[in-house]
């Protein structure tokens, strides 16, 4: 009898352990890449059975005339927010691999005098110096033969230990470039990089991978593509059919890829599709926020072919745009340490509201470090100190590199732009209702904060949703690093980001756009309230 009770007790214990193990196994399985095909059948079918995924706030009623709790009718009944039908999702862009090509661009030139000069940063010799006779044409028919451009060099003498004089050659740098080869930009020259004296040009350029999650920041994405398109070798862009809050959204970026909107950069874009929402993401928004970057990194890197360990990986938010010169330096030089960050100019609602300080977020390292130290997890790169990771010592011993975190730029020398909430009022509205449920207070839950007239008032004054009024003055459009060059050259399209559309035009004495010359003149400013695009 006792033996029978003992066996019955053991059976109940084993059944309980099996049930607990199954629950933990399923929860762990949902975070791995390979079961996403299974999860795509219904992202919340099984998870809603074990975990309560009910939203903290009531959902809007989809029926006409029903109560719209915490949502306005523009959002609740908009057909743009319904998932795409299967017929439009037939093209499997998210399964296509991208082969990284070799960069064959000749960035440096070797002179006869022994100098190695960075072409864009070195002053060219257009005329022979005084005292040198003009070169005679060597063409057979009297036409001058084409010769490669000449670069100015400066020769110096250094006294050796035994009194012998040694000559070496340096390039003559253009403003904004530094170093013996004129390839070190100002954002590196004035950074806290501890190994500046060890910087040397590479024989073969690295490839640069830029990873981004996108929701509806398509104008800023277009600016990124134009700003970095010639130095970045692969843009890994992740899009989900869920917002960060867990509600359905259309695959707008995939549509823009297929209809030719981004045809000029299509060959460099690797499309990543996140077709499920992580369990627990509705209750804790940071789970969803972190998982987006984890999935982006793991799925994206796994589909890059011809990848080398010393290639550069940079992960950004959609509103963070690194400066081209800094990214090009990482591509062309050896001797810098890792991981690295960018000091970015901070703006709110548009580049016209410049916030004090800089945004400094660790966002890049080599592919080797990403795999060995961070375990191919982009959120660890952005939020975890490398010395807290268990494998960083093994990585140092294997590579012989001492890991020292540094930042491109400084508080006085911006190495990029961070434009927060930089949308039209309608775009800010969509950001409010799409925001994850973890960064409290969640302003999208308040009906008055979603009012478009209220949002226009925030853009006009630079205020915040909590009612505070900032004291910083509007930025001067003539300042260096005011905005990316592509924006400045296309004022008519991006004027809502460059000039406050709800303020009176600045006078010429205030240094407004009339001082910018042909690069960015404003159009007629008759109706300020109709300035959205």
UniProtKB/Swiss-Prot annotation:
Catalysed reactions listed for this entry: N(4)-{beta-D-GlcNAc-(1->2)-alpha-D-Man-(1->3)-[beta-D-GlcNAc-(1->2)-alpha-D-Man-(1->6)]-beta-D-Man-(1->4)-beta-D-GlcNAc-(1->4)-beta-D-GlcNAc}-L-asparaginyl-[protein] + UDP-N-acetyl-alpha-D-glucosamine = N(4)-{beta-D-GlcNAc-(1->2)-alpha-D-Man-(1->3)-[beta-D-GlcNAc-(1->4)]-[beta-D-GlcNAc-(1->2)-alpha-D-Man-(1->6)]-beta-D-Man-(1->4)-beta-D-GlcNAc-(1->4)-beta-D-GlcNAc}-L-asparaginyl-[protein] + UDP + H(+)
Predominant location category: Golgi
Enzyme Commission number: 2.4.1.144
Ranges annotated as spanning the membrane: 8-23
Cytoplasmic compartment segments: 1-7
Compartment(s): Golgi apparatus membrane
Membrane-protein topology: Single-pass type II membrane protein
GO MF, one example: glycosyltransferase activity
EC class of the enzyme, as a word: transferase
GO biological process, one term: protein N-linked glycosylation
Pathway the protein contributes to: Protein modification; protein glycosylation
Segments on the Lumenal side according to the record's topology features: 24-533
Swiss-Prot/TrEMBL keywords: Glycoprotein, Glycosyltransferase, Golgi apparatus, Membrane, Signal-anchor, Transferase, Transmembrane, Transmembrane helix
Family membership: Belongs to the glycosyltransferase 17 family.
Task of the protein: It is involved in the regulation of the biosynthesis and biological function of glycoprotein oligosaccharides. Catalyzes the addition of N-acetylglucosamine in beta 1-4 linkage to the beta-linked mannose of the trimannosyl core of N-linked sugar chains, called bisecting N-acetylglucosamine (GlcNAc). It is one of the most important enzymes involved in the regulation of the biosynthesis of glycoprotein oligosaccharides. The addition of this bisecting GlcNAc residue alters not only the composition, but also the conformation of the N-glycan.
Protein name per its UniProtKB record: Beta-1,4-mannosyl-glycoprotein 4-beta-N-acetylglucosaminyltransferase
Upper taxonomic lineage: Eukaryota, Metazoa, Chordata, Craniata, Vertebrata
């Amino acid at each position: 009898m006792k033996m029978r009770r003992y066996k019955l007790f053991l059976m109940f214990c084993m059944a309980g352990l099996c049930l607990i193990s199954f629950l933990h196994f399923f929860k762990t399985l949902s975070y791995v890449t390979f079961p996403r095909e299974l999860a795509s059948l219904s992202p919340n079918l099984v998870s809603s059975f074990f975990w309560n995924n009910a939203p903290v706030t009531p959902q809007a009623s989809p029926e006409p005339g029903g109560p719209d709790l915490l949502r306005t009718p523009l959002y609740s009944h908009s057909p743009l927010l319904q998932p795409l039908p299967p017929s439009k999702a037939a093209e499997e862009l998210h399964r296509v691999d991208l082969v990284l090509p070799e960069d064959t661009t000749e960035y440096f030139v070797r002179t006869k005098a022994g100098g190695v000069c960075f072409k864009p940063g070195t002053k060219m010799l257009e005329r022979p110096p005084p005292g040198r006779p003009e070169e005679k044409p060597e063409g057979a028919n009297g036409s001058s033969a084409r010769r490669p451009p000449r670069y100015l060099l400066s020769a110096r003498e250094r006294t050796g230990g035994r009194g012998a004089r040694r000559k070496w050659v340096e390039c003559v740098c253009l403003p904004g470039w530094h170093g013996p080869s004129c390839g070190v930009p100002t954002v590196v020259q004035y950074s806290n990089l501890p190994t500046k004296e060890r910087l040397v040009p590479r024989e073969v350029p690295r490839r640069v991978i830029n990873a981004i999650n996108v929701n509806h920041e398509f104008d800023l994405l277009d600016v990124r593509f134009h700003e970095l398109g010639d130095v970045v070798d692969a843009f890994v862009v992740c899009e989900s059919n869920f917002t960060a809050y867990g509600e359905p959204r259309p695959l707008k970026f995939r549509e823009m890829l297929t209809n030719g909107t981004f045809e000029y950069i299509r060959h460099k874009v690797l499309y990543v599709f996140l077709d499920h929402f992580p369990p627990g993401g509705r209750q804790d928004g940071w789970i969803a926020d972190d998982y987006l970057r984890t999935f982006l990194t793991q799925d994206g890197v796994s589909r890059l072919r011809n990848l080398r360990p010393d290639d550069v990986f940079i992960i950004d938010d959609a509103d963070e745009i690194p400066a081209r010169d800094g990214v090009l330096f990482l591509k062309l030089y050896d001797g810098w340490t890792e991981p690295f960050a960018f000091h970015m100019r901070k703006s709110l609602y548009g580049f016209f509201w410049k916030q004090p300080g800089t945004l400094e977020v660790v966002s890049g390292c080599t592919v080797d470090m990403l795999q060995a130290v961070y375990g191919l997890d982009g959120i660890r790169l952005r939020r975890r100190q490398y010395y807290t990771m268990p494998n960083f010592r093994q990585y140092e011993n294997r590579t012989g590199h001492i890991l020292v975190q540094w930042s491109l730029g400084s508080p006085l020398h911006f190495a990029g732009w961070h434009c927060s909430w930089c949308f039209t009022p309608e775009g800010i509205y969509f950001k409010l209702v799409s925001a994850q449920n973890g960064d409290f207070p969640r302003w999208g839950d308040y009906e008055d904060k979603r009012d478009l007239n209220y949002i226009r008032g925030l853009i006009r004054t630079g205020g915040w949703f909590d009612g505070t009024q900032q004291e910083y003055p509007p930025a001067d459009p003539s300042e260096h690093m005011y905005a990316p060059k592509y924006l400045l050259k296309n004022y008519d399209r991006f004027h809502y980001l460059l000039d406050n559309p709800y303020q009176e035009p600045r006078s010429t004495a205030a240094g407004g756009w009339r001082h910018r010359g042909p690069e960015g003149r404003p159009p007629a400013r008759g109706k300020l309230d109709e300035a959205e695009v």
